[in-house]
């Protein structure tokens, strides 16, 4: 354990305990989740209802993945392994921590591949500790069918479930989970700076554009980890036809990942003058690239980058996928969708955006309003706070268990 991790652990243990102690268990503590966790901590402290401690993997410096530290964060590295060839993971030693310190409630990632999701609810219940699952519910990974088979039995193990969107809530209700036991915390990233600090972000975006020699070009931007599920290859396959729509069109692909060098090499072979693959960029430059692009496009495994794109009021095109992350984009209302893998559909969406700027502007204005007023960090925090308060009250018998 590093000195920084020791400080984090000690600080969390010595935090004020006027209220209930609520533990949140995550595979890794990511920097982009800190605004949510900060908000939950502030809600709990505001009336002395609870304090949080967040457990998960940190980086080599003892900081959250992507940077940042908090007094409520405690290091708990995740271990990876396989069962019958299926990737799984677990938190070594967490059961003993639970027995030794006995929190008042536990919030944990709800994923069938996490081994302790099958055992911790039983252990916690034997100790009188309510357990909340925090889950996307739906997955687009190639092994998602395994989760789908296990879901009905899996989610009934938890006292309550926090989900990322309405589609997840509907899926759980169809599986027999009581609607009253589900809390919809619409998944988002911190977009507040887009509405309060847009000039600074946009200025940085223009610097990036100029530095890449793209001033005056129409930018088609894709941000997403470079793995097969993100389907960057679809963009490369469609590129000759996309460029035919507008000779001034350039494609920028931002992020790192296992397929980075492969994608970079293919882009170089297809059109090195018009396709830029940046690799991973410094914190904040993802926002800056989105601020300066003309169209955002996300061909697969849609994630939180679309929230940034919608908040900036950029025309945003996604593959038509199930799931909470993508549900905020409604075709023709807040963005554009095409059938996943359908290159003709992708190209048609890009052409529609370019050919009808007035209609595109109306769609983008609705999306920006949605992100400013509804899909917010504050609303996400509020739902998580509500779920935690229900769990804590189970200790006093105010709310029934399943």
State the predicted function of each range.
Residues 23, 214-230, 236-239:
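Conserved donor-binding/catalytic core segment of Leloir-type glycosyltransferases
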Residues 115, 127-146, 157-160:
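A short, histidine- and acid-enriched strand-loop-helix "catalytic/donor-clamping" loop
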Residues 156-206, 214-215, 277-278:
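Donor nucleotide-sugar binding/catalytic pocket of nucleotide-sugar-dependent glycosyltransferases
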Residues 261-281:
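Nucleotide-activated donor-binding/catalytic signature segment of Leloir-type glycosyltransferases, i.e.
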Residues 280-281, 287-293, 309-310:
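Short alpha-helical donor nucleotide-sugar binding micro-motif in glycosyltransferases
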Residues 291-302, 314-315:
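Acidic donor-binding loop of glycosyltransferase active sites
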Residues 331-332, 336-343, 352-358:
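Conserved acidic donor-binding segment of nucleotide-sugar-dependent glycosyltransferases
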Residues 345, 352, 359-374:
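A short, well-ordered alpha-helix in the C-terminal region of glycosyltransferases
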């Amino acid at each position: 354990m590093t000195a920084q991790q020791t400080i984090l652990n000690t600080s969390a243990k010595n935090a004020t305990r006027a209220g209930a102690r609520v533990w949140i268990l995550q595979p890794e503590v990511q920097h982009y989740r800190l605004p949510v966790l900060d908000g939950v901590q502030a809600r709990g402290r505001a009336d002395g209802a609870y304090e949080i401690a967040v457990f998960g993997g940190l980086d080599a410096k003892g900081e959250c993945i992507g940077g940042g530290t908090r007094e409520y964060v405690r290091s708990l590295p995740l271990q990876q392994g396989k069962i019958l060839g299926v990737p799984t993971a677990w938190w070594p030693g967490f059961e003993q921590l639970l027995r030794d310190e006995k929190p008042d409630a536990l919030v944990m990632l709800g994923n069938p591949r996490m081994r302790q999701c099958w055992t911790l609810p039983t252990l916690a219940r034997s100790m009188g500790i309510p357990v909340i699952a925090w889950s996307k519910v739906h997955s687009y990974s190639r092994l998602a069918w395994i989760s789908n088979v296990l879901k009905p039995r899996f989610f009934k193990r938890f006292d309550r479930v926090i989900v990322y969107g309405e589609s997840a809530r509907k899926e759980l209700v169809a599986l027999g989970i009581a609607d009253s036991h589900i809390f919809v915390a619409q998944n988002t990233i911190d977009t507040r700076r887009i509405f309060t600090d847009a000039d600074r972000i946009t200025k940085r975006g223009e610097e990036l554009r100029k530095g890449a020699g793209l001033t005056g070009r129409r930018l088609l931007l894709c941000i997403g980890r470079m793995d097969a599920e993100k389907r960057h290859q679809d963009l490369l396959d469609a590129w000759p036809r996309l460029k035919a729509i507008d000779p001034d069109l350039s494609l920028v692909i931002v992020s790192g990942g296992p397929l980075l060098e492969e994608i970079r090499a293919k882009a170089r072979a297809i059109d090195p003058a018009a396709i830029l693959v940046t690799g991973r960029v410094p914190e904040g430059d993802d926002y800056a690239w989105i601020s300066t692009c003309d169209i955002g496009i996300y061909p697969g495994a849609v994630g939180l980058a679309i929230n940034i794109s919608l908040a900036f009021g950029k025309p945003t095109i996604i593959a038509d996928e199930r799931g909470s992350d993508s549900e905020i984009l409604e075709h023709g209302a807040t963005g554009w969708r095409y059938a996943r893998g359908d290159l003709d559909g992708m190209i048609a969406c890009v052409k529609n955006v370019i050919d009808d700027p007035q209609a595109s502007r109306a769609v983008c204005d609705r999306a920006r309003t949605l992100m400013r007023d509804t899909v917010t960090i504050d609303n996400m925090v509020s739902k998580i706070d509500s779920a935690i308060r229900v769990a804590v009250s189970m200790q006093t018998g105010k709310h029934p268990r399943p």
